[in-house]
A protein has these predicted regions:
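N-terminal membrane-sensor/transducer module of prokaryotic signaling receptors
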Residues: 2-174
Length: 174
C-alpha cells in the first residue's frame, strides 16, 4: 500500500513538473479562489444595478419625449424589448396612479394602483407621485415580492417625471 502511494505522489510530482506540495496547495487555493470570484461575477451579472435602472428610466423618458406616448408604450410593454433586462423593467403611471405601461406584467396596465401598499403598509405608488410632483425625479425604498424567489425583498425604485407621467424602474437590494 505504501509503495502505491509513493508511486502516486511521484506521478503527481512528475505531472506538475517538480512542483512541491506547498506550491500544489497554493495553486489549488488560487484556482478555487478564482472559481469563487467568477461565480460571484456571474451571480451579480444576473441582476440589474441601480445605475442600470436609472439609465433605463432616462432612455424611456427620452423615447416618450421624442416618439410620443403610444409608440413608447408599445416598446415599454414588449417583454422582449429594450426596456426589459434581467430583473429590470420599466413601469409607467399617470399622475393619478393608473398604470399605463408595464414591461414585466401586462395585467397591471389600466389598473388604478394609487392605494397599493407594501408589506409595511407604505403607499409606494403615492410616494412615487409625490416624488415626481415635488422633485421631478428621485429614489424610493419599499418592499416587494421578488418574482424569482417569491420572497418579499427590499427594493428601490428610481422614478422620473415625463410630462404628465411617472416613469420608473426598480432594483432589488441584493
Amino acid at each position: 500500500m505504501r509503495r502505491n502511494n509513493k508511486k502516486r505522489i511521484d506521478l503527481i510530482h512528475f505531472i506538475l513538473g517538480g512542483a512541491s506540495m506547498k506550491r500544489l496547495i497554493a495553486m489549488t487555493i488560487g484556482i478555487s479562489f478564482l472559481g469563487l470570484m467568477a461565480g460571484n461575477i456571474t451571480f451579480a451579472a444576473q441582476f440589474g444595478t441601480a445605475a442600470e435602472a436609472e439609465a433605463m428610466v432616462k432612455k424611456a423618458v427620452q423615447l416618450i419625449k421624442t416618439e410620443g406616448k403610444e409608440k413608447a408604450f408599445v416598446e415599454i410593454n414588449n417583454p422582449k424589448g429594450k426596456f426589459v433586462d434581467r430583473d429590470l423593467y420599466i413601469f409607467v403611471y399617470d399622475m393619478s396612479g393608473k398604470c399605463v405601461a408595464h414591461g414585466f406584467n401586462s395585467k397591471m396596465i389600466g389598473k388604478d394602483l394609487i392605494e397599493m401598499k407594501d408589506t409595511d403598509g407604505k403607499f409606494f405608488v403615492k410616494e412615487r407621485i409625490e416624488i415626481a410632483k415635488t422633485k421631478g425625479k428621485g429614489w424610493q425604498d419599499y418592499k416587494f415580492t421578488d418574482p424569482i424567489t417569491k420572497k418579499i425583498e427590499q427594493k428601490s425604485a428610481y422614478v422620473e417625471r415625463a410630462e404628465d407621467l411617472i416613469v420608473g424602474c426598480g432594483v432589488y437590494k441584493r
